[in-house]
């Protein structure tokens, strides 16, 4: 298989993020990444199987909403156009057939022959009506399937956004809680003092 261009993959990831502009999307991505790295490095959040499963699920939902839904929508549209074309062609053929039979019947003088011709025409008309009804049913089924898929895609997008908001809220709450911890504050202060002393030592 042909390897996917990293630039294309990066653009697809950024497009899947919420936001109206490239700057807002990259800002969300950078903020999320920074918060995640800080939480993991400070042991506020431990990466486990549930985290990996959540990331995989979100990626799968993003892939489905970006690839499968547009493909199915285009396929359903093409199928609907094809069926509508068949219906129009069947109607035109039926009209032409009726006109031809009427012309033929008008030239007949034998009552028996005329009756037989009308009977054959009625059978053909019934068959064409049955075919037209079947095609209409197929169009209705295709439209219903597309409507269901569109609803499912919207629902999955809402679920994904809600889960992202919950995850961000949880991480932020843990970070804020840890920042209010006296031991953590002392640890940060000690690290800052140590860094300053190290810089002064280098200057000497």
From Swiss-Prot:
Gene that encodes it: ATP4
Pfam families: Mt_ATP-synt_B
UniProt keyword annotation of Calcium present: no
InterPro entries recorded: ATP_synth_Bsub_B/MI25, ATP_synth_F0_suB
Descriptive protein name: ATP synthase subunit 4, mitochondrial
Any single GO CC term annotated in Swiss-Prot or TrEMBL for this entry: mitochondrial inner membrane
PANTHER family: ATP SYNTHASE F(0) COMPLEX SUBUNIT B1, MITOCHONDRIAL, MITOCHONDRIAL ATP SYNTHASE B CHAIN
Family: Belongs to the eukaryotic ATPase B chain family.
Keywords per UniProt: ATP synthesis, CF(0), Hydrogen ion transport, Ion transport, Membrane, Mitochondrion, Mitochondrion inner membrane, Transmembrane, Transmembrane helix, Transport
Protein function: Mitochondrial membrane ATP synthase (F(1)F(0) ATP synthase or Complex V) produces ATP from ADP in the presence of a proton gradient across the membrane which is generated by electron transport complexes of the respiratory chain. F-type ATP synthases consist of two structural domains, F(1) - containing the extramembraneous catalytic core, and F(0) - containing the membrane proton channel, linked together by a central stalk and a peripheral stalk.
Transmembrane intervals: 27-47, 52-72
GO terms of molecular function: proton-transporting ATP synthase activity, rotational mechanism
Quaternary structure (record): F-type ATP synthases have 2 components, the catalytic core F(1) and the membrane-embedded component F(0), linked together by a central stalk and a peripheral stalk. The central stalk, also called rotor shaft, is often seen as part of F(1). The peripheral stalk is seen as part of F(0). F(0) contains the membrane channel next to the rotor. F-type ATP synthases form dimers but each monomer functions independently in ATP generation.
Membrane topology per record: Multi-pass membrane protein
Annotated localization: Mitochondrion inner membrane
